[in-house]
């Protein structure tokens, strides 16, 4: 026993080089955001000089005001918030519902349909732009926010994610017990299955939120009016056809990044816990 205790203490002790590696990784991850802020507080000449400037300047609020004057940036942030929130919530609920159906409900063609869902993950997103735009045009949704929300309410990856998680975490005996008590399929899902897989659905919703917030290609194609721009399209509108004002562009980019950083600070611990829970249970 005298030799086991020191050995366990040695294994439980964190080495100094572990902290060094974690600190280096943290600096590497945060440096792009810091550099973005530096450029957002200076002009293009200062941003491109050699050696580069490493101390923030004093022009951030002036450039931020210029961003607001150039494009309706606050409205763009609100549009992005609405679209990203709707897509995040929609994916969390609808993908969980579809994953539950593929995992626990028996119906003709279940395996074939799930295989088709998986095959759609192999199709590049760019190939769906033209038919998707044609559908939006027929519906009269071009230059509307629902053209961004509706196509993103479900995803093949989200359905696969939730199907695997539900298969691993919800037993058939639990569902049978609920059905014996008189619950129908919807009640089993909403009152039993969904509360159990809520952490995984929460993580999926966050992934959907971040993806929708950072999306550029589809909003750039379908949106025409400045008052309906999302944050990424508003940043593109800050650039003209001939040159790029780096300070102006980075000021808009920094203001569009701050909400994501704040979101991660608020829910980062819960997101990591949801990912680890799915990893251990799977």
Task: Name every feature range the model reports, one short phrase each.
Residues 14-282:
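A structural signal for multi-pass alpha-helical bundles of membrane permease subunits
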Residues 1-11:
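Short, Lys/Arg-rich, polar N-terminal cytosolic tail immediately upstream
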